[in-house]
């Protein structure tokens, strides 16, 4: 969920500050949630840090996370405070980021393809087999992409879009 460099830095600082030996395991949000669910009766995870909001809210709703009201909560953005309240203080948003798609300009130029500018552009036949997407079952970001499309288009049109996009997907990572 969080970039490896951030995980390494956080782990180093935490270990130095507390003297505790830690083991950081990097996973997608969906995979992390599945592990917490599987370990519900015998938890092996102490801290789940990072990832998209929806799986954290699901974990809170399922009773997989503990209540914690940070003394720094008032310093966070209003959306993060709302997430904490909504979850009964069992999760809190710590960062946000844009959702979009990236492309390889050199590959597009080599194949004489126009730069995709909208989600609809990714449906064009010239992109058949050229699009990669993370698996929403294991990636919180891919899950968030689907949730965003549902919010933008409505559920029926969003899933029609995903069905139309599928032939252009070369790999679900």
Language model features by range: what are they?
Residues 1-8, 29-31, 43-173:
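Extracytoplasmic ligand-binding site segments that recognize negatively charged/polar headgroups
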Residues 21-31:
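A short beta-strand-loop structural module common to alpha/beta enzyme folds
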Residues 9-23:
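Short alpha-helix C-terminal cap/hinge motif
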Residues 12, 16, 38, 151:
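Short, well-ordered alpha-helices that flank and scaffold nucleotide-derived cofactor binding pockets
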Residues 34-41:
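Short, well-structured alpha-helical segments in soluble
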């Amino acid at each position: 969920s969080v970039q490896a460099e951030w995980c390494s830095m956080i782990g180093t600082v935490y270990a130095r500050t507390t003297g505790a030996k830690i083991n950081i395991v990097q996973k997608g949000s969906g995979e992390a949630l599945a592990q917490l669910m599987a370990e519900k009766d015998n938890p092996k995870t102490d801290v789940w840090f990072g990832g998209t909001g929806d799986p954290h809210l699901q974990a809170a709703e399922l009773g997989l996370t503990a209540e914690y009201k940070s003394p720094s909560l008032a310093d966070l953005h209003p959306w993060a405070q709302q997430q904490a309240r909504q979850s009964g203080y069992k999760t809190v948003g710590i960062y946000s980021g844009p959702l979009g798609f990236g492309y390889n300009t050199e590959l597009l130029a080599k194949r004489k393809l126009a730069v995709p500018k909208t989600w609809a552009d990714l449906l064009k036949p010239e992109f058949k087999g050229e699009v990669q997407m993370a698996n929403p079952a294991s990636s919180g970001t891919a899950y968030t992409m689907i949730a965003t499309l549902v919010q933008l288009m409505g559920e029926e049109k969003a899933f029609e879009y995903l069905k139309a996009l599928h032939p252009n997907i070369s790999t679900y990572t």
